[in-house]
Amino acid sequence: MKFSLKLNRSVFCGILFFAAIPSFAQNEHAKAANGKQFIVDSEIPWQDLGGGLKRKIMSYDPTMMMVKIDFQKGGIGTPHKHVHTQMSYVESGIFEVTIGDKKQTLKKGDGYYIPSNIMHGAVCLEAGVLIDMFTPMREDFVK
């Protein structure tokens, strides 16, 4: 059985156009946000949050956000919850992290996952930095 498909130029161009839409949408997200496709830490200012915490909003678009949080020893990420899904990486330091009713001590190289609307918090046992990823982005952080 031989199968043959002949396309004229306008049909072919239409197929290419619709196939490219996801690519166009992805590029629009990058332009709609803070525009940081390359993140240079030294170019981003710290925001003092008080209580021994400061934050850098590294980059974001409507679908995700990366934030760096510096904790002094004894700093507390007050227990809270939000609709955003969160993944965090311990860049340095030691933290006691509570997610729901579970508690774990985490150090450099460790990480954790927080589902939407689950109560969570952290206590810094040794000064350090957490890298947080949120989806969707935390609009409350940029207002």
Question: What would you call each of these model-derived segments?
Answer:
Residues 102-116:
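Short acidic-glycine-tyrosine-enriched beta hairpin
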Residues 91, 107, 126:
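A cytosolic small-molecule/anion-sensing beta-strand core signal
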Residues 24-63, 143:
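A short, N-terminal "cap"/entry segment at the start of jelly-roll beta-barrel domains
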Residues 65-81:
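Conserved short histidine dyad/triad with adjacent acidic residue
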Residues 11-22:
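Bacterial N-terminal signal peptides
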Residues 1-12:
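Bacterial N-terminal signal peptides that target proteins for export
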Residues 83-95, 100:
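Glycine- and acidic-residue-biased ligand/ion/polar-headgroup-sensing regions
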Residues 116-140:
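Ligand-binding loop in jelly-roll beta-barrel domains
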